[in-house]
Amino acid sequence: MSRWSLHFLGVGSASAIELGSASAVLERDGEPVLMIDCGQEALTAYLARYGAPPRALFLTHTHMDHVAGMERLFVQLYFDPARRGDCRLYLPAALVPWVQHRVADYPGVLAEGGVNYWDAFRVVPHTRGFWHEGLWFDVFEVRHHAPGTAFGIALPGSFVYTGDTRPIPEVLSSIGQGDEPIAHDCGLFGNPSHSGIDDLEREYPVALLARLHLYHYGSTADGDALRVRGYPVMQAGDDLALSPPRQR
């Protein structure tokens, strides 16, 4: 039987560079299956761990701590004929114009000309979810800045990953099989864009709180304070053991 895990490349908020930009990789038997988000530090950590660029990538939203590595990834993919156009980029359909505006629309992506940013990728837009390597991944909208601009991802039976979000009890109650570990955005204090631990304890039932594994916090000290509250707090380099996917 395959061994499944979620490897955390980084767990920090946008200002917590020392914790790495928030990103994780679904692994099967230690090999990467799907990278989630591609901040600058996340791409560096990915290359250090796996020795090659990702072959599959899902983006939760387009804030720069989650997409700043995309220009560098383009260069690495495009100039390797064996990888050019081979990286599957799974994009919620609503994010396609934002990736275009934020990353792909820079004039003259290569000085030599004759190249489109998207030539390096195999783009797979989706709404409710997508198939990858025979697995169905659920995709769901979260609460982060403007509506329709941020999304989470779940592999039924294995994990839920919220991406950046405020509390979403009504969403998490209907995603997955109901017993997966939930990697959840959580700082020591909340704000209009991100969850704080008091927000989660106020809005989530005890059974849901028991499934949380916290990431996207502001400092090592904040992480320690969250642990004192009794929650698992992920660190860069951690592996979260997963149950095998339960597919349709």
Question: Residue spans of the language-model regions?
Answer:
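Core dinuclear metal-dependent hydrolase active-site scaffold
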Residues: 1-49, 122-170, 238-248
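A short helix-to-beta-strand connector/capping loop
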Residues: 2-4, 85, 113-122, 133-135, ...
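Hydrophobic/aromatic beta-strand patches that form the interior of the parallel beta-sheet core
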Residues: 7, 58, 90, 124, ...
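Short active-site oxyanion
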Residues: 30-34, 85-88, 158-159, 209-212
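Active-site neighborhood of phospho(di)ester-bond hydrolases with catalytic His/Asp-centered motifs
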Residues: 35-39, 46, 55-65, 92, ...
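Active-site metal-binding motif and surrounding structural segment of the metallo-beta-lactamase
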Residues: 40-90, 178-180
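Active-site neighborhood of divalent metal-dependent phosphoester bond hydrolases
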Residues: 82-87, 94-123
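Cap/insert and terminal regions of metallo-dependent hydrolase folds
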Residues: 167-248
